[in-house]
Regions:
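Extracellular/periplasmic bilobal clamshell ligand-binding domains
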Residues: 288, 305-339
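N-terminal secretory signal peptides and thylakoid transit peptides that target proteins
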Residues: 1-14
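A ligand-binding cleft/hinge motif common to bilobed small-molecule-binding domains
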Residues: 103-107, 228-245
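Immediate post-signal peptide segment of exported/extracytoplasmic ligand-binding proteins
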Residues: 25-44, 63-64, 167-169
């Protein structure tokens, strides 16, 4: 005969039993995804991170773990958007996964080119301010600061903040990525415009910065002493400049940043492999690869994966990021201010 105590005990065990069954079902469902991905044999990723060394390492790690080949196509964000539009209209979709900046990804999401990725075991891993939604998972973060020539600028004279660039000593001495075109310069303009105001940029324009679009060439120009400062500087790139008389500066206000996102294209020909790659993005292996190259992971606890000289970069204060809805307006405003 069941006593009241026995009934209460059974009632307490019921939720645990249901939870265990649910977890087992999820495990079985995910095993079907993994098995399906292996049958598909490959996944095609379209990436806007042209020439970065991380993607080939991720491809190698993915195939080693799952036996699924990752085929990589790299191109500029605008070129990828047009390619995807053409594929979607024609009904001949070749790409599976998008790997692109959050601004481009947001614009594409509004165009309806992605499909929900469903449940992923690792979807809850990102830490604030990064999080996944129904279409996108964050993958890694690019942060920007300043690059300074250590032979031309004494430690006491180094700019410590974005506001310090307005000091009279830097008039005509600042090399900058073009703020009037898509890229790091536009990110810097939008974020600092939002946080420091239009007046800040009007004053910075009077400093007569020399702007161009020769990103890595600009690093060398600063190292050669042609200019003492370059902004905005991709902080992770300092790891490639170890033997040169330059250093990075993390501004006191914080760093503009852009998040790279992963998403699955509508009609992806390898849907299981696409989901598997999306989950793989958020695992320690991939996040550790990004950290090792000085890029900020979107999950916690991986600072130790980075070289000692990059750990400060991974912990840098974040100022803000871009807003896809404001992109055209901000480019127009930058053109008005920086003539």
């Amino acid at each position: 005969m069941l006593t009241r105590r026995s009934l209460l005990r059974l009632g307490a065990l019921a939720p645990l039993t249901l939870a265990a069954r649910s977890a087992a079902a999820q495990t079985d469902d995910w095993k079907k995804v993994v098995d399906g991905a292996r049958k598909e044999g490959k996944v095609v990723m379209y990436s806007g991170a042209v020439g970065n060394p991380m993607s080939p390492k991720i491809a190698t790690a993915f195939e080693a773990k799952y036996g699924v080949r990752l085929e990589l196509l790299e191109a500029r964000a605008s070129e990828l958007r047009e390619r995807v539009r053409t594929e979607q209209v024609s009904g001949r979709v070749l790409g599976d996964v998008s790997h692109n900046g959050s601004t481009t990804t947001s614009l594409q999401a509004a165009e309806g080119v992605f499909q929900p990725y469903g449940a992923l075991p690792s979807a809850g891993r990102p830490v604030a301010p990064f999080k996944a939604d129904a279409l996108r998972v964050p993958v890694y973060v690019i942060t920007w600061g300043m690059l300074v020539n250590t032979e031309m600028v004494k430690p006491a004279d180094e700019p410590k903040s974005w506001q310090d660039l307005l000091a009279p000593r830097w008039k005509g001495q600042i090399l900058a990525d073009d703020m009037r075109a898509l890229g790091g310069g536009a990110v810097f303009f939008m974020v600092t415009y939002q946080h420091l105001g239009r007046e800040y940029h009007e004053k910075l324009a009077r400093q007569q910065p020399h702007m161009n679009r020769e990103l890595r060439g600009n690093y060398r120009r600063v190292a050669r002493g042609e200019y003492p400062i370059f902004v905005p500087f991709t902080l992770a790139d300092v790891l490639d400049l170890k033997d040169l008389p330059v250093k990075h500066v993390i501004p006191a206000e914080g760093c503009p940043y852009v998040r790279f996102d992963g998403a699955i294209f509508k009609g992806a020909p390898h849907p299981n492999a696409a989901r598997l790659l999306m989950d793989f993005f958020l695992g320690d292996e991939v996040q550790g690869i990004y950290a090792a190259f000085g890029f900020r992971p979107v999950v916690g606890g991986l600072d130790g994966k980075a070289p000692a000289e990059a750990r400060g970069i991974l912990q840098a204060k974040l100022l803000g990021t871009t807003d896809a809805k404001l992109q055209d307006e901000m480019l127009k405003t930058a053109t008005q201010i920086y003539k």
